[in-house]
């Protein structure tokens, strides 16, 4: 085997004579390794990997150059320095597009309304709503998502045109629909613009909407183009799996961010019977540690916070409520549809918002909450509409709390005389008087009128009568006797007017054969005449419902009052 010949020594200097000669094939091998890297990819593989990217870059650059050279804009260029007397206007998108748009769907704003475009003065920022410029024609184009990322507002017309995108080779037009819009009083709407291709084929994977005028404006007015926020365009097949903002209670749990349909989180939650957003939120409220363990102990704080933030943007159902009584029966909780405590009542008093509680009350509530969350099956559904009406806000039906003793026993005027009533009734002159000793507080009594705080509480025997204007509750047979089982006879609700000179008050009028409770009150601010509640009229809804509520409450305590009156009569020998 013959070795390669070396260069002769006499033809070179002393330095070159000492040079180590390397065979030619080894030189080529070292060069190839330097280019490809030791153990790197082959040249063909590198070409195959770089070719698509190079094609896109070359295609975009060549297309922009051809478009700017072959189709020069007829509009005045923003590269020119505008004269001091010239006017500068600009188009502007008012609404933001959503972060993700699907092919085949109309482009809409985040709130679901059409995207609006307005023409404003660049100096005063006032909208141009009159003149010939307020009705110019505008063209909608698609821009590369990288355009405007530096937040520059002084781009040139050529820069804007160079960022306009066209469809990929062999594809349909990138956008279809009404791409030319005529402004009306300086305002236009993007009603029917549809993407036909996704945005995954460009480097930033995002598009922007752009708007530019179609025809050149007269005079020295320059109108700058408008650009929208960047957004992604995905294939319409992904719309079936899109997230909801905000999510709804009945949405499946995979509608939440970071929970993929049929993914690991979804399967773990389904195994624990957490199928909807409502189930997710209920478990989050009652036992957040258990929820996080279901998702996996290794879940990062960032992923956890993202899921929780999206879930908490859900709006609870205002018509679904629950109550829970504590073990001591002193605290009653009012919970919403996801088991959050919204109001609390103590000893049957009015419901109070949680934020208005004292420190000691909050301790009691926390203890009751722990009991409730351990026994969620003991929560009682509570339909507030059955008591307060469907159209009345919850807080509107909570009058100022007043102590029962202050309301009923301020003026211990329990007289039994039978004076001549202003109602014109024929009554006997039999009379009696007594005082109540150690009266039991009556819970839940609230005034119908502020004047009732100083009103007396009278018990007078009368015969049944007919009156055009009355507010009466005909009670049970045997009221005032020792009968325990009663049967309501009639509930008559009509508009009430003052019938006595002492002011607003309650009058107990027991008849010894058939007793009745005449419930009279006056509401100067809400006066109605000779009309029943069911008729169409202008009334004060709050006062009307307060009347009904008070009547129902008086019905619930009438039995105890009758027993005490019976005992007093027996002690004084009034009856046998």
From Swiss-Prot:
Its main location: nucleus. One of its GO terms (cellular component) is nucleus. Residues 8-25 have a biased composition (Basic and acidic residues). It is found in: Nucleus. Residues 1-80 are annotated as: Calmodulin-binding. GO terms for molecular function: calmodulin binding; DNA-binding transcription factor activity; sequence-specific DNA binding. Residues 150-273 are annotated as: DNA-binding. The keyword Transcription applies. InterPro entries: Calmod_bind_C (IPR046829), Calmod_bind_M (IPR046830), Calmodulin_bind_N (IPR046831), CBP60 (IPR012416). It comes from the Eukaryota. Residues 1-25 are annotated as: Disordered. Keywords: Activator, Calmodulin-binding, DNA-binding, Nucleus, Plant defense, Transcription, Transcription regulation. GO terms for biological process: defense response to other organism; regulation of salicylic acid biosynthetic process. The keyword Nucleus applies. Transcription activator that binds DNA in a sequence-specific manner, likely 5'-GAAATTTTGG-3', to promote the expression of target genes. Required for pathogen resistance. (Microbial infection) Interacts with V.dahliae SCP41. Interacts with calmodulin (CaM). Belongs to the plant ACBP60 protein family. This is Calmodulin-binding protein 60 B. The lineage of its organism: Eukaryota, Viridiplantae, Streptophyta, Embryophyta, Tracheophyta.
